[in-house]
């Protein structure tokens, strides 16, 4: 579908665009709040600065798409593919990313407060300076993930795999890391005050009491 036609339909009140092929589409600064984009193919699309609040992008493919500065607050991205996607400075507050694939994604300085990333694959993703305050990362995979300077205050990381993750200067105050795997993780300068590490595997491979 031509982008102009999509925008005309949206302006006319249509919100259902499920399954569309928008691969490589130019949608920079587009306004589509509340749209149904379930299973849409947006691989390589340009969505910089887009307003996508409350959008349904579940099962959509946004691999290698550019969402730099996009607003996805409250959006549903459950089981969406966001591999190598540019999400720098994106607003992902209260976004549902359960079981989403974000391997190699760039989330530098992104806002993920209260987001649900449970069971998501975040291996090798870049969360440098990102805010994940009170986010849910229960059983998420964060192997080799860059969390330098990230804010993880009161974040739920129960059972998460943080092996070889870089948490230098990360704020993990009051986070819950019960049974998490921190094998070979780098915690230099990290703030762990009040964090629950019960049963967690520490960087040296030993289990925390």
Please give the residue ranges for each predicted region.
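Tandem repeat scaffolds
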Residues: 2-209
């Amino acid at each position: 579908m031509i982008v102009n036609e999509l925008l005309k339909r949206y302006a006319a009140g249509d919100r259902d665009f499920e399954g569309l092929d928008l691969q490589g589409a130019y949608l920079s600064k587009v306004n589509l709040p509340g749209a149904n984009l379930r299973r849409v193919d947006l691989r390589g699309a340009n969505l910089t600065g887009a307003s996508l609040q409350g959008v349904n992008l579940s099962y959509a493919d946004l691999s290698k798409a550019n969402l730099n500065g996009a607003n996805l607050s409250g959006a549903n991205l459950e089981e969406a593919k966001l591999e190598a996607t540019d999400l720098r400075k994106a607003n992902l507050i209260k976004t549902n990313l359960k079981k989403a694939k974000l391997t190699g994604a760039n989330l530098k300085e992104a806002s993920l407060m209260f987001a649900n990333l449970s069971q998501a694959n975040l291996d090798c993703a870049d969360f440098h300076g990102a805010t994940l305050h009170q986010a849910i990362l229960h059983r998420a995979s964060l192997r080799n993930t860059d969390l330098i300077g990230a804010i993880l205050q009161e974040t739920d990381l129960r059972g998460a795999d943080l092996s070889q993750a870089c948490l230098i200067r990360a704020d993990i105050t009051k986070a819950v890391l019960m049974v998490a795997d921190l094998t070979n993780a780098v915690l230099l300068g990290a703030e762990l005050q009040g964090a629950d590490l019960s049963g967690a595997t520490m960087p040296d491979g030993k289990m925390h009491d």
